[in-house]
């Protein structure tokens, strides 16, 4: 069996540069991009959550990436940004990118094996605000989506303990501001006196007018 020549193929596993810790700490240089996520790291408290800090060998996922979708290049092993990618590098079925083939053609050749998200085209149409409030004058010709829901009886009575997590709908009514002002009490009294005086004057006029005698 031939042995490798140490001159041609030297063993450099025990040789390190002095600036490697700086690159690893500041830029995550030399770390496996598929390493596991740190279970101690809290993105809401990044300074005091993980005891190893920036020297932790596991991945620290920032809070700004919590609502991102999965990187489509990472799914194929072609992402070159590593930890600095603005998309997620993890399998999360709820945050998969949309399947472009399905969105354009209405079907996907990968069927159940497709890793991307199949979004119903009807769900992209915005809901009709007038219909949600009770009535839409355009009816079936409306360009927006009419979603039939069952009204929550508890909400209609005044209060629903489930709030936004209720399985029934909670209608929202827009009340227009009429800019009404309440009159002061003195104006109300003056108005009532004026009405009473005008009524007394009309009664006096009727009494003073001569009445026709019937033959």
From Swiss-Prot:
A zinc finger (C3H1-type) spans 32-63, 65-92, 93-121, 122-149, 151-173. PROSITE patterns: ZF_C3H1. SMART domains: ZnF_C3H1. It comes from the Eukaryota. It holds the Pfam family zf-CCCH. Component of the cleavage factor I (CF I) involved in pre-mRNA 3'-end processing. This is mRNA 3'-end-processing protein YTH1.
């Amino acid at each position: 069996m031939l042995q490798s020549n140490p001159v041609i193929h030297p063993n450099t596993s025990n040789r390190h540069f002095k600036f490697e810790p700086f690159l690893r700490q500041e830029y995550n240089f030399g770390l496996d991009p598929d390493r596991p996520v740190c279970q101690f790291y809290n993105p809401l408290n990044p300074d005091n959550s993980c005891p190893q800090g920036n020297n932790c060998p596991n991945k620290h996922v920032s809070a700004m990436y919590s609502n991102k979708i999965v990187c489509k290049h990472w799914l194929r092993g072609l992402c070159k940004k590593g930890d600095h990618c603005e998309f997620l590098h993890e399998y999360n079925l709820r945050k998969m990118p949309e399947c472009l083939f399905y969105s354009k053609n209405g079907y996907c050749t990968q069927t159940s094996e497709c890793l991307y998200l199949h979004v119903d085209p009807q769900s992209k149409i915005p809901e009709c605000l007038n219909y949600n409030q009770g009535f839409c004058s355009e009816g079936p010709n409306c360009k927006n989506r009419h979603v039939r829901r069952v009204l929550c009886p508890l909400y209609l009575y005044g209060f629903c303990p489930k709030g936004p997590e209720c399985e029934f709908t909670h209608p929202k009514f827009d009340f227009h501001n009429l800019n009404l002002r309440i009159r002061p009490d003195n104006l109300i009294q003056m108005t009532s006196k004026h009405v009473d005086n005008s009524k007394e004057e009309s009664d006096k006029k009727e009494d003073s007018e001569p009445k026709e005698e019937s033959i």
